[in-house]
Every structure is written in structure tokens, then in C-alpha cells.
Amino acid sequence: MTLRQLCGSPKRLLLLLLTLVPLLTSCDPKEPTNELLNKRHDNPSYVIFTLKEAKLNDPTRWDAEPTLADITLTGREEKMTLSLTSKGFLASEEQGVSHFSVKSTDTESDVVYLLEIDYLDARRELMNGQFIENGQDRIHQHFFERFTREFIRGKWRTYAVKEPEELGYDYRYVDVTPWNQPYNAPESKFTGTSNPMGFKGLIRFTRADWKFLLTIMLMHAHQPKIYNGQAMPFYNNLYYPIDQESDISLNVAFVVDAGTTDLTGREESSSN
């Protein structure tokens, strides 16, 4: 028996088809969210870097997953505030420094710095939680990279420094969960190794008497950032083949000791 014979007339057949259309369309699978169009977080309008000088209570702890419990703050700190403008994020000296002045481990072997990163929206309200809560911590991670320039075949070319011993600095993630609680709160758990974020981290400078640009990049991955059970190192966001983009990428100037050797790349750029 045909569908037309069952319905009895073309008019009844048309009514039946109109009734079935909503049922069929309701069974379609839900389209996946396009993270390129819907990041599930706002874009920051302000970035605040706070650098706090500290001492390692036991220098041997540096290679054994140090936490905030392993340092003692000296009370010296610098703050850099960058505001989003038509020319990108620019540092305001009225609201902080334009570069960070630090000491190398050659000058003081136990010196280390706590680097804290805060993002604010257009209303100047803290929005760090948007990159962490509701599973966003699984796809976000800060990286702290350095790039070098070489004059090859008549052109200046830029390369990422991929060997950690050539960086001139070293970094450790010291994030805690919950992210908005003190590290020594009863509910706080150290997650700097298992789930590196970089909103809080320890950095020290192993090369003496130089200045450079530290590229601080917040990765937004389109898949879990932990690859085969491993997190990517702080100095290379391309260490594993993870589909990603950057939410933020900023060059921050550091002057180590007297800053005699200039590795910012600005001299090469001006001579080109």
C-alpha cells in the first residue's frame, strides 16, 4: 500500500507531511559550538602585571615543584597596567611602570619573583574567572616566551627561543584551586603542575646584566591543553600539535641588573 493510498487524498498527504517535518527536524543533532565565534568569555580591556620580589627559602626547591609556601616576599613590588587603545595594549606610566627592573641570580642567588596577572573588563571588574571557571581552565594557559632576531640573507628574521638553557630566565607555574582563594586557605590545592594556568607564577633570571622583551601569551586552545597526559612547557606553546589561538599576546620589557646587553631587538629593527 502506498502512502497516498493510506492517506486517501493529496490534501491529506500534504497535511501528514507538514506534521512530520517538525518531528524530523527536532531529531537533528545539535551543532557543535564554534569556539572561534563563541569563546565563552569577554575580551579584556585592561591587563595588570604585578611583580613581587621574593627569596627562596630553600634554593634547592626550585627544581622540585616550588609553591608559594617556598618563598618569602621582601615587600618590593612593581605594577604594570596596560590599557586597550586603538593601537593595542599600551602601558600607562601614570598607573605603573613601563618596564620591570629585576636582579639576576648572579647578583642574588636566592632571588625570585612572583608574577601575578589580572584581567579587567571595560568596567574595570576582575574577569580572571572567565578563563578558569566552567571548564575554561582546560583550554587556557599562559606562556612566557622569548624571541630572537637574526640577520639572514639580507633580512632580519624572528625566531622563538626553544632551548630552555638559552632563555636567560626560568619559570614555574604556582596556580592554586580555587583560583580566588589564598594558597594557604584550607580548601586550596596546588595545581601548578597538573593544570598550569600562569595567573600566578615564579620567575627568576639566570642571565646577568641584560634587557629583553618577554612575550606573555594567553593560549585559547580548541581542544584540551593536556596532550597525552603532558602539559606544554612555559616557553613553547607549539610544543604539542594543539589547535589554538591567542586571547592575549603582549611584549613586556625587563631590565636585568644594569641591563647593559640589549636583546630587545629594537636596535636591529631601527637599523634595518
PLM-predicted stretches and their roles:
Residues 1-25:
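Sec-dependent bacterial lipoprotein signal peptides
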Residues 21-49, 55:
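Bacterial Sec-dependent N-terminal signal peptides
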Residues 31-32, 125-183:
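Extended, polar beta-sheet/loop recognition surfaces of beta-rich domains
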Residues 34-42, 77-146, 243-245, 250:
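N-terminal onset of structured domains
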Residues 38, 99-113, 179-243:
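Exposed beta-sheet edge/beta-hairpin loop segments within beta-rich domains
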Residues 50-89:
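Post-signal-peptide N-terminal segment of Sec-exported extracytoplasmic proteins
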Residues 82-102, 158-202:
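A beta-strand/beta-hairpin structural motif
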Residues 229-272:
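Short beta-strand elements
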